[in-house]
Amino acid sequence: EQTLNSHDRKLQASRCMECGVPFCHWTCPLGNKQPEFQDALCKGKWREAYQVLNETNDFPEFTGRICPALCEKSCVLKLSCDAPVTIRENEAAIAEAAFREGYIVPVRPERNGWKIAVIGAGPAGLSVAARLNACGYEVTIFDSKPMPGGLLRYGIPNFKLPKEVIDRRMDVLKAEGIRFEMGVCIDMQKLPAGFDAYAVCTGTPTARDLTIPGRELKGIYFALDMLAQQNRILDGETFPKEQLVNARGKRVLVIGGGDTGS
């Protein structure tokens, strides 16, 4: 992970020009207010920077590590001199400072009497649960996996997103009153009773297939299956030998050069 000290982080943030039309904000799927939290950061106002970031982003410690950083690709400094503000790394630094300095304090809101079931404990389900819980709804998350996180836990390698970072946030959500029912397969024809509404947040766990010559040959695997299996092995799970995806000693061709392929 990037290890620039706080002084260098502030210098990076000071490079933000607070453009009249902030393309960084416009291209961010979350609508993050990059110029505003960069301004607070460059002035050393870490708490304020986190407050601005938290307005639009429930989990900046995740996105600050694995987001494709569309904001940086559209940064005017990127377009003019190919050296954008390090927005994503600044975001991660702000989130880590918030945990370290105690800015993140679990709050159990006053309940409004409504119960919501969230199906899926991936990033979408967790975000929905966090927002609904903050509004006073009593939220229970269901997921078929033994641990929450979805692709954050089972699809992203540890070197990009350490699992203790996920666990730390789950502890906050639990302390705020969100309940987790893990290892539960939900039948969409028979939803769990006792809830006023349901949010289906099952994500996209199915890999994209290719209809090309040779697709039927043996030894072809989806990256998601391989990454998920490796993460589960690191968590202590075991698999029969015939189910293991092992490339040791073999010549490997990777189709796709994005983050997953890398």
Task: Give the residues covered by each predicted segment.
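Ferredoxin-type iron-sulfur electron-transfer modules in oxidoreductases and energy-metabolism complexes
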Residues: 1-13, 33-65, 81-108
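Residues forming the flavin
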Residues: 1-7, 12, 91-262
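Generic secondary-structure signature for well-ordered alpha-helical cores
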Residues: 14, 18-21, 42, 46, ...
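Iron-sulfur cluster-binding cysteine motifs and their immediate structural context
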Residues: 18-43, 64-92, 140, 144-147, ...
